[in-house]
Amino acid sequence: MSDSSSVPVDFVLNFSTAALHAWNGLSLFLIVFISWFISGLTQAKTKMDRVVLCWWALTGLIHVFQEGYYVFTPDLFKDDSPNFMAEIWKEYSKGDSRYATRHTSVLTIESMASVVLGPLSLLAAYALAKAKSYNYILQFGVSIAQLYGACLYFLSAFLEGDNFASSPYFYWAYYVGQSSIWVIVPALIAIRCWKKINAICYLQDKKNKTKVR
């Protein structure tokens, strides 16, 4: 970690931290609320399926729109207008200044997330809603990809000194706290899908052995 003087940013925030958290939290809540409501009209069989569907909808939209905005708006940190999407990234860069400098590592990770993982996450939500045969395999694959991206994110920072935060608070709240969500949740979903796939394979093997007899 470092003091604020080592963070190479010269932008001006147009929203307070509290206001940004309030608006961002409201946006995320609405996405989850709408996703939960829609999931009740789908073939998602259990409450856990509905929770997972909400995750895929949420993470998919974040990848496509929020992270996509960062990737495809190179001058966002020069934007001095009250642009909510730009302000979100200005705020997050307090925890990881690599975003403000568009460091190659984070730009690469975010590019893959917005272009590849975003659409695949939304497809995973659709597959779960429609109970598609590729449902668990897709969820497992995307979760592993998210874990891989998260590992690259943390490891690249560690190898470069891990000193990109403006204060210990932003280091733990933003860099560690927020980013860890994409370690914990994908890991849990990957484990769940692995068990589901194994159970299906076991039943199929048992069925095949019964036929042979």
From Swiss-Prot:
<dbReference type="GO" id="GO:0016020">
    <property type="term" value="C:membrane"/>
</dbReference>
<feature type="transmembrane region" description="Helical">
    <location>
        <begin position="171"/>
        <end position="191"/>
    </location>
</feature>
<comment type="function">
    <text>Isomerase involved in the biosynthesis of limonoids triterpene natural products such as azadirachtin, an antifeedant widely used as bioinsecticide, and possessing many medicinal applications including anti-tumoral, anti-malarial, anti-rheumatic, antibacterial, anti-inflammatory, anti-pyretic and diuretic effects. Catalyzes the conversion of 7,8-epoxymelianol to isomeliandiol via skeletal rearrangements.</text>
</comment>
<keyword id="KW-0812">Transmembrane</keyword>
<comment type="pathway">
    <text>Secondary metabolite biosynthesis; terpenoid biosynthesis.</text>
</comment>
<dbReference type="GO" id="GO:0004769">
    <property type="term" value="F:steroid Delta-isomerase activity"/>
</dbReference>
<keyword id="KW-0413">Isomerase</keyword>
<comment type="similarity">
    <text>Belongs to the EBP family.</text>
</comment>
<dbReference type="GO" id="GO:0000247">
    <property type="term" value="F:C-8 sterol isomerase activity"/>
</dbReference>
<keyword id="KW-0443">Lipid metabolism</keyword>
<protein>
    <recommendedName>
        <fullName>Isomeliandiol synthase MOI2</fullName>
        <ecNumber>5.3.3.-</ecNumber>
    </recommendedName>
</protein>
<feature type="domain" description="EXPERA">
    <location>
        <begin position="48"/>
        <end position="190"/>
    </location>
</feature>
<keyword id="KW-0444">Lipid biosynthesis</keyword>
<feature type="transmembrane region" description="Helical">
    <location>
        <begin position="18"/>
        <end position="38"/>
    </location>
</feature>
<keyword id="KW-0753">Steroid metabolism</keyword>
<feature type="transmembrane region" description="Helical">
    <location>
        <begin position="109"/>
        <end position="129"/>
    </location>
</feature>
<feature type="transmembrane region" description="Helical">
    <location>
        <begin position="52"/>
        <end position="72"/>
    </location>
</feature>
<keyword id="KW-0752">Steroid biosynthesis</keyword>
<feature type="transmembrane region" description="Helical">
    <location>
        <begin position="137"/>
        <end position="157"/>
    </location>
</feature>
<dbReference type="InterPro" id="IPR007905">
    <property type="entry name" value="EBP"/>
</dbReference>
<dbReference type="GO" id="GO:0016126">
    <property type="term" value="P:sterol biosynthetic process"/>
</dbReference>
<dbReference type="GO" id="GO:0005783">
    <property type="term" value="C:endoplasmic reticulum"/>
</dbReference>
<dbReference type="InterPro" id="IPR033118">
    <property type="entry name" value="EXPERA"/>
</dbReference>
<dbReference type="GO" id="GO:0047750">
    <property type="term" value="F:cholestenol delta-isomerase activity"/>
</dbReference>
<keyword id="KW-0472">Membrane</keyword>
<keyword id="KW-1207">Sterol metabolism</keyword>
<keyword id="KW-0756">Sterol biosynthesis</keyword>
<dbReference type="Pfam" id="PF05241">
    <property type="entry name" value="EBP"/>
</dbReference>
<keyword id="KW-1133">Transmembrane helix</keyword>
